[in-house]
Design a protein with these regions (language model features):
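Conserved helix-turn-beta segment of the N-terminal RecA-like "Helicase ATP-binding" lobe
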Residues: 18-43, 54, 213-217
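Inter-lobe coupling linker of SF2 helicases/translocases
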Residues: 48-93, 102, 109, 113-140, ...
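A short beta-strand element within the Helicase C-terminal
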Residues: 205-208, 451-465
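Conserved strand-helix element at the start of the C-terminal RecA-like helicase core
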Residues: 322-329, 374-397
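Conserved helicase motor "Helicase C" RecA-like lobe of SF1/SF2 P-loop NTPases
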Residues: 385-415
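Conserved SF2 helicase motif VI
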Residues: 468-486
């Protein structure tokens, strides 16, 4: 981009564990490039200004840093004040003519939080030793795995409708403030999002992507809010859905259909270059037997008894007999997922039950380990619940214990959680690629996006099911990109 004059000082931000991997790939393509790489230590409080000074005064072909480091680069007080005031104005607009009391209450709470944040900002003393993002000279931003910033605050009258983003995150708000600044500065350009899942489990996520990348185009069309976008391009429907307890059904309003889809895609394609696997003609290995292998286990008597307790808890909540602080549907969903994985996660005093999922997975891993022994083929095991913890029972350590008992050497088993720094992760990934580590366990958040370990990959195991289909896609990309091993 710099050679073509598109950008003077481009910044690439990637998931925390991919900084070194990205830099390595960049140097493979451009061995003589002048790249500034931000390590975790560079953004420690005492070193932050020094590194920001390097960005400001240096001439680089690219700057590469982690998502979390990027968030530590502040905007000026004036820009942040303007940003917060704009959000407050959007809430006031959404509150007009609103009759739904719960939605009014939600919007008012959001407004009060913003007003408190604004008050704190205005009362804070200027920091003379801080270099703001605007002062660094960065004029182009590339965001890898941009879907991780989807939880951008939406001011809407549809808060009680499923399929509308109901949460907001500070990092999404921070990114939006910076992309807004760059788009204004670069006349609608200067920002690129890279993601394989721009929409994962909510239609409103498409609006968020458009708000990030083409707010000026939406405004030219007279679309200034999510509600105006939804009334033009989406439809609220009533649908019959399984109750969270798993016992019975309920009617739920959901934003589930697009309207005027050709027009919507025409607008989105003004900023989106969409490529599918078929478009790119990527070499994709065939899954054994043409589809995933599902291993269904019969529930133990203990698990069936526990699920009946879940149903009774759900019914008590629906009748209003329980204080939400004591029990609620979120707790029930969490406990149900834990119990389905291993009952010891909800009651540590229990022994291993019949048809333990940990043992069933370990048996499959051991079988594949034997089959791939000569070629040193590897297996990746995903589990988002019950990650390693020395103080309590967890599925990771249970699987490892069983595998060692079966005969797999301990040094051939590892967790992504054991690699704390970027350098450690790079070394660990190389060991997996070389087949030194043959059973590698991790979670979607730490290992799901962009992890390059597929060279000798034979099998990928899903121990638990994540909430979003996009998380399954993120997990399986390692297998899709892998060479085919038999």
């Amino acid at each position: 981009m710099k050679r073509l004059g598109i950008a003077h000082k481009p910044l690439i931000i990637v998931p925390n564990h991919l900084v070194q991997e990205t830099a390595k790939s960049f140097y493979e393509l451009y061995p003589n490039a002048n790249i500034l790489i931000a390590n975790k230590d560079d953004f420690q409080k005492q070193k932050r200004r020094i590194f920001a000074g390097k960005i400001t005064t240096g001439e680089y072909d690219a700057i590469i840093m982690a998502h979390s480091s990027f968030e530590k680069m502040p905007m000026s007080k004036e820009v942040e004040e303007q940003h917060i005031n704009k959000q407050i104005a959007e809430i006031v607009e959404a509150q007009s003519d609103l009759k739904n009391r719960s939605t009014v209450k939600q919007l008012e709470s959001a407004k009060q939080r913003l007003e408190k944040r604004l008050k704190t900002l205005l009362e804070s003393k200027p920091k003379d030793n801080v270099i703001n993002f605007e002062e660094t000279g960065i004029d182009y931003l590339i965001v890898d795995e941009a879907h991780l910033f989807k939880n951008l605050m939406i001011q809407t009258k549809l808060n009680d409708v499923a399929g509308v983003i109901g949460t907001s995150s500070q990092r999404a708000s921070d990114l939006y403030m910076k992309t807004e600044f760059l788009l204004d500065k670069q006349n609608g350009k200067g920002v690129v999002f890279a993601t394989g899942t721009p929409v994962s489990n909510s239609l409103s996520e498409l609006y968020v992507m458009m708000k990030y990348l083409e707010p000026h185009i939406l405004e030219k069309m007279g679309i200034y809010s999510f509600d105006e976008w939804a009334s033009t391009f989406a439809e609220v429907t009533n649908s019959l859905e399984l109750a969270p307890s798993g016992n019975g059904y309920r009617v739920r309003q959901r934003l589930s259909k697009f309207h005027n889809l050709p027009e919507l895609m025409s607008i989105f394609r003004m900023v989106a270059d969409i490529k599918t696997k078929e478009d790119l003609n990527l070499p994709v290995p065939q899954i054994k037997n043409g589809k995933p292998t599902i291993i269904a286990l019969e529930p133990s008597n203990e698990l069936e008894e526990y699920m009946q307790k879940i149903v009774k808890r759900s019914e008590a909540i629906q009748r209003g007999n329980v204080d939400p602080k004591e029990d609620n549907m979120l707790k029930i969903s969490s406990d149900g997922k834990k119990a389905a994985l291993d009952l010891r996660l909800v009651d540590s005093t229990l022994e291993e039950t019949k048809n333990s999922k940990a043992r069933a997975v370990a048996e499959q891993i051991y079988k594949n380990w034997l089959e791939g022994k000569e070629q040193k083929l590897t297996q990746v095991v995903f589990c988002d619940l019950s990650t390693p913890n020395a103080d309590r029972f967890n599925v990771y350590d249970e699987i490892k214990k069983i595998l060692i008992e079966m005969g797999i050497p301990e040094n051939e088993i590892d967790y992504i959680h054991n690699s704390k720094t970027d350098i450690q992760k790079t070394k660990t990934f190389q060991k997996v690629r070389d087949g030194e580590i043959r059973v590698f366990l991790g979670s979607t958040s730490k290992m799901g996006a962009g992890t390059n370990i597929q060279d000798k990959l034979k099998v990928l195991h899903h121990i638990d099911a994540p909430w979003r289909p996009s998380d399954i896609e993120q997990r399986e990309r390692k297998n899709i990109k892998a060479r085919q091993h038999k």
